[in-house]
């Protein structure tokens, strides 16, 4: 079965075609970074309007690249939540309208399930069970994954997500949007040892996270440097960026390793936008060696929000017998707030 997937939960418009037997056939992605840069963050109304402009051309592009027509499509999938309500409604409306016009089933997918399963698009493909570290701008969670739809929450952030800590710290340093990648690039030129920043909850003994204290510590350093009309010099900014990144990465890696030890598992899947961070990947590669454990990441091109992960998650649900393939009446809703535990498979 060929599934056409749509992602529009925030500031990326993604469309993809996935075959349940052959995997990813084609995907196309448009990012709104340039549009939101002048505002320093995502403007929900602008995001929704841009999704409307982009989704049909991207759909045509994917079908052309895959050598398909709508007659070849057996089901449609879309991100049903969580995310920005207006943005979610664009992808959901297009998917449901297309499904209605072709008498096809429409499958609503949890955004985080898309991220969680996206490393399975790469080779070698991790086998179940595994521990998943989901790290993005809006979420930081550790999950035990025993199969598609079989997820156990092990720990999560109690305040800011890791990606949010990157972005907010970058903003405090006067870096551009999106802050996380800008901070990571600047950190390459810095000396992390110059600033002693906290590692919140590093030794808490549990698998939860907290990054608000780190953000406050960064603010304190910036205020100290700019007191009495001073400014944060270029090298100071690079050093502070390096120290901030090192603190976030150390906590993420330590908690992930603790999760592996507590569960007895030896496979770690890392997904979400922060999963593209080079220091995190390198740090985990070193830290996992003594455990004889392996880390799995999605391709860099699929770390951000994308349609491929949504179509693929739908395909995995179809193969696991967890998708309702009846056509239905195409009445639908979206869920801006949605706990991943709510989609457990029995």
Curated annotation (Swiss-Prot):
Group of enzyme by EC: transferase
Residues engaged in binding Fe cation: 111, 115, 305
SUPFAM superfamilies referenced in this protein's UniProt entry, alphabetically: Actin-like ATPase domain
Classification via Pfam families: TsaD (PF00814)
Gene from which the chain derives: tsaD
Recorded family membership: Belongs to the KAE1 / TsaD family.
Cofactor note: Binds 1 Fe(2+) ion per subunit.
GO molecular-function terms, A-Z: iron ion binding; N(6)-L-threonylcarbamoyladenine synthase activity
Residues engaged in binding substrate: 134-138, 167, 180, 277
Gene Ontology BP annotations: tRNA threonylcarbamoyladenosine modification
Alphabetical UniProt keywords: Acyltransferase, Cytoplasm, Iron, Metal-binding, Transferase, tRNA processing
Superkingdom classification of source: Bacteria
EC number of the protein: 2.3.1.234
Signal peptide feature range: none
Catalyses which reaction(s): L-threonylcarbamoyladenylate + adenosine(37) in tRNA = N(6)-L-threonylcarbamoyladenosine(37) in tRNA + AMP + H(+)
Protein name as annotated: tRNA N6-adenosine threonylcarbamoyltransferase
Cofactor(s) it depends on: Fe(2+)
Organism expressing this protein natively: Bordetella bronchiseptica (strain ATCC BAA-588 / NCTC 13252 / RB50) (Alcaligenes bronchisepticus)
GO cellular component: cytoplasm
Location of this chain's protein in the cell: Cytoplasm
Function: Required for the formation of a threonylcarbamoyl group on adenosine at position 37 (t(6)A37) in tRNAs that read codons beginning with adenine. Is involved in the transfer of the threonylcarbamoyl moiety of threonylcarbamoyl-AMP (TC-AMP) to the N6 group of A37, together with TsaE and TsaB. TsaD likely plays a direct catalytic role in this reaction.
């Amino acid at each position: 079965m060929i599934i056409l997937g749509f992602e529009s939960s925030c500031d990326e418009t993604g469309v993809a075609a996935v075959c349940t037997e052959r995997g990813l056939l084609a995907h196309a992605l448009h990012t709104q970074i340039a549009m939101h840069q002048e505002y320093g963050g995502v403007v929900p109304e602008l995001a929704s309007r841009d999704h409307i402009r982009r989704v049909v051309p991207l759909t045509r592009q994917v079908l052309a690249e895959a050598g398909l027509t709508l007659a070849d499509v057996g089901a449609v999938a879309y991100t049903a939540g969580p995310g920005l309500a207006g943005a979610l409604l664009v992808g959901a409306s297009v998917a449901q309208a297309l499904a209605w016009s072709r008498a096809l089933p429409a499958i609503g997918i949890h955004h985080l399930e898309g991220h969680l399963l996206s490393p399975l698009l790469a080779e070698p493909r991790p086998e179940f069970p595994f521990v998943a570290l989901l790290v993005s701008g809006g979420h930081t969670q550790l999950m035990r994954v025993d199969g598609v739809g079989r997820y156990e929450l092990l720990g999560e952030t109690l305040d800011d997500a890791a990606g949010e800590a990157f972005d907010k710290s970058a903003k405090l340093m006067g870096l551009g949007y999106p802050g996380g990648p800008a901070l990571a690039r600047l950190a390459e030129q810095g000396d992390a040892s110059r600033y002693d920043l906290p590692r919140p909850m590093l030794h808490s003994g549990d698998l939860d996270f907290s990054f608000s204290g780190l953000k406050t510590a960064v603010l304190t350093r910036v205020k100290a440097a700019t007191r009495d009309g001073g400014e944060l010099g270029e090298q100071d900014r690079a050093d502070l960026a390096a120290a901030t990144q090192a603190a976030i990465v150390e906590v993420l890696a330590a908690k992930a390793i603790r999760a592996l030890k507590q569960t007895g598992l030896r496979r770690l899947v890392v997904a979400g936008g922060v999963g593209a961070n080079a220091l995190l990947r390198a740090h985990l590669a070193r830290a996992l060696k003594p455990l004889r454990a392996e880390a799995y990441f999605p391709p860099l091109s699929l770390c951000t929000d994308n349609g491929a992960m949504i179509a693929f998650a739908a395909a995995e649900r179809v193969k696991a017998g967890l998708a309702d393939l009846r056509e239905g009446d195409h009445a639908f809703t979206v869920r801006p707030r949605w706990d991943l535990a709510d989609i457990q498979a029995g």
